Amino acid sequence: ECSLYLENAIDEAMFLQQLNSLLPEDIRVLRVAKEKRDFHARKSAVGKCYEYRIDLRDKMEVFHRKYRFHFPNPVNIRAMEKAAKYLTGTHDFSSFTDLKEDKDTVRTLFAVGIVYEEDALKLSWIGDGFLYHMVRVLTGTLLDVGTGKIKPEEIPEILKAKDRKKSGFPAPAKGLFLSRVFYTEEELDEAVREIRER
């Protein structure tokens, strides 16, 4: 998501086409829309959804190697789901960030989705905002829960500790995608509901 201010009116469809013609093949602008003058792509957002994709096969699918984290281990999805419930809500996520500067570390996780299909996991994280490396550390922590290194019941203690050393490893960046930014409460509520109904 991005925002810009233009002095002259534009044809949105033409602008979209021209913009995409200038971008590399792996980046696409999907929509162009006029907004109010005070709109800001980051500050006007009420929530974001990140997805993290993990390949659990012994040998990773060759076409997924750039876009998924290869983690060839059996995982206990029920334990991961239990741990995710402890993470949902408003918490100080100091234990789950590599942030070095003093900054407000309280965030709200509205929903965590865990979907297993065809030897792959898709984790969906919907929150009001995320700290530096937060989704990667949360993902690594859930994988540590899934392999038995961390018990689901330890998550509240890890949150209380406010100590990065207590949480799991940071999953690599290559499985992480910003999948959606929400600008209305209705959109956000619908996405949260979809995850909870899975």
Regions found by a protein language model. Name each.
Residues E1-R198:
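Structured-RNA-binding interfaces characteristic of tRNA pseudouridine synthases
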